């Protein structure tokens, strides 16, 4: 007698839709050079209990649908026994805490990584006076400041997730950096998360260029 296959606790059709959305956007980010050597991870809220996320160790420029898996909001695989990114908890803590967050993107561009090293000592990069600050949801003027927090890198994701958790309610955040690592950015959907990610990339690049121009020769 054949065992009855248990129904999936999520919509397979919705997963297929999100996999295509993720793969297309991730491929563009890979082509920009922001996901070197299989690095980076990406996710999208699937429903109120699950997220679609990239499988660990896959070339982000060559993803196929099987490279997108499902995890619950505790970071545990659901449906297929695949290994999610080591940093899955940094995604799921955002979905669990903020129901409005629909997409989380994590990249490793040179600009993001260099900025994270340069500002690790202060733990923050202040961005102010830029017109592009209005790219962040809720900002309506350049006459404001956005503090991008820089967290120390660690292989203990429980520790890092707890550090992030402690600061999520203390200021407006659209993303943060991890020292020597890269950038996390999020939004209500893929389009908004991409906008925030690209705004951070541009503004961090401007800050690095200003540092060079101000340095004595």
Curated annotation (Swiss-Prot):
Zn(2+) binds at residues 106, 108. Binds 1 zinc ion per subunit. Pfam families: Aldolase_II (PF00596). One of its GO terms (molecular function) is zinc ion binding. One of its GO terms (cellular component) is cytoplasm. HAMAP family: Salvage_MtnB. Catalyzes the dehydration of methylthioribulose-1-phosphate (MTRu-1-P) into 2,3-diketo-5-methylthiopentyl-1-phosphate (DK-MTP-1-P). This is Methylthioribulose-1-phosphate dehydratase. It comes from Xanthomonas campestris pv. campestris (strain B100).
């Amino acid at each position: 007698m054949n065992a009855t296959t248990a129904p999936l606790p999520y919509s397979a059709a919705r997963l297929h839709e999100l996999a295509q959305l993720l793969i297309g956007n991730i491929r563009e980010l890979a082509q920009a050079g922001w996901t070197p050597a299989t690095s980076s991870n990406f996710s999208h809220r699937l429903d109120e209990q699950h997220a679609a996320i990239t499988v660990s160790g896959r070339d982000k420029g060559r993803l196929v649908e099987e490279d997108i898996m499902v995890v619950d909001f505790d970071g545990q695989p659901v449906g297929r026994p695949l290994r999610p990114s080591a940093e899955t908890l940094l995604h799921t803590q955002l979905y669990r805490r903020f129901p409005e967050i629909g997409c989380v993107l994590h990249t490793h561009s040179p600009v993001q990584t260099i900025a994270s090293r340069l500002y690790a000592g202060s733990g923050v990069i202040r961005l102010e006076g830029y017109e592009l600050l209005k790219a962040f949801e809720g900002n309506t003027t350049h006459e404001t400041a956005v503090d991008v927090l820089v967290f120390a890198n660690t292989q203990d994701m429980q520790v890092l997730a707890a550090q992030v958790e402690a600061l999520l309610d203390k200021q407006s955040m659209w993303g943060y950096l991890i020292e020597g690592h890269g950038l996390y950015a999020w939004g209500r959907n893929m389009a908004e998360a991409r906008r925030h990610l690209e705004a951070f990339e541009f503004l961090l690049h401007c800050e690095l260029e200003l540092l060079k121009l101000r340095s004595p020769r």
